[in-house]
Amino acid sequence: VTGVQTCALPISVWREVLGAGRVVCVLGAQAANTFTADEALTCPLWRDDPDNPRRGQTCQQQGIDAIAIAPYFGSYLGDPEQAPRVRAMSLDQLFAEISSTAIPESAGWIREYDQLAHDRGLALVSYEGGQHLVGASNDDALTQLFVSANRDPRMGQMYDAYLAQWRGAAPHGTTGLFNHFNYAERYGVFGSWGALEYVEQATSPKYASLTRYAQTPCWWAGCAVG
């Protein structure tokens, strides 16, 4: 059973059961590498296989509607080779780096995928996203820096700028639904992923930014308000 077959069969089943107009079929890819999406959408080995009953067709032609990526910002700051430099940063320096480098890096990925989605007539969505400040090892100093940054009011400002790029860095207008990872989770050595640190927490800089973003009108085709 090929990857294309495991893609095409569920698509056809869901559309038959629920109705084609109610199903959006999404292909996941790596945010930093458009090749992963382009290759999966084309499936050249399957397309050109002489034993393929659908020879000449691409994976995209089996019913793909959208590409999904996880355009996190700041993942490189947790790389082992970056640890000595980042560990020595103050919060001011870390936020300056996020603003000048980390968010623009993510915006560049969005821009490249916006072009790819536009060229292929597809939508672009986010299956995950947000900050990615997590160390590669048990480094207490690095962990404390990243946790403090996630609690700092300036992280809300970073999120405002980041979420604005989800639409602003896509001149072709392909971007749509953005999913943040995640809702509530304790911060620590394995990351500070939650918009909140626990379910009962009233708010946080990240949560407030995400709430503001969620209240803005949606702009993509087929979206519903209310």
Regions found by a protein language model. Give the residues of each.
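Substrate-binding cleft and catalytic face of glycoside hydrolase catalytic domains
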Residues: V1, G21, C25
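Aromatic- and acid-rich polysaccharide-binding/catalytic face
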Residues: V1, P50-T101, R120, Q131, ...
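Short, small-residue-biased leader/transition segments that mark boundaries at the very start
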Residues: T2-G3, C7-L9
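Short helix-capping segments at alpha-helix termini
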Residues: W14-A20, C59-Q60
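Structural recognition of the beta-strand scaffold that forms the well-ordered cores
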Residues: V24-L27, D65-I69, A123-Y127, G176-H180
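Substrate-binding cleft/loops of secretory-pathway carbohydrate-active enzymes
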Residues: L27-I64, A68, H132-L142, Y187-E197
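Catalytic-core region of carbohydrate-active enzymes that cleave or remodel glycosidic bonds
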Residues: R55-G56, S100-G129, D139-T174
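Aromatic-rich peripheral "rim/lid" segments of glycoside hydrolase catalytic domains that contact
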Residues: S137-Q165, T174-G226
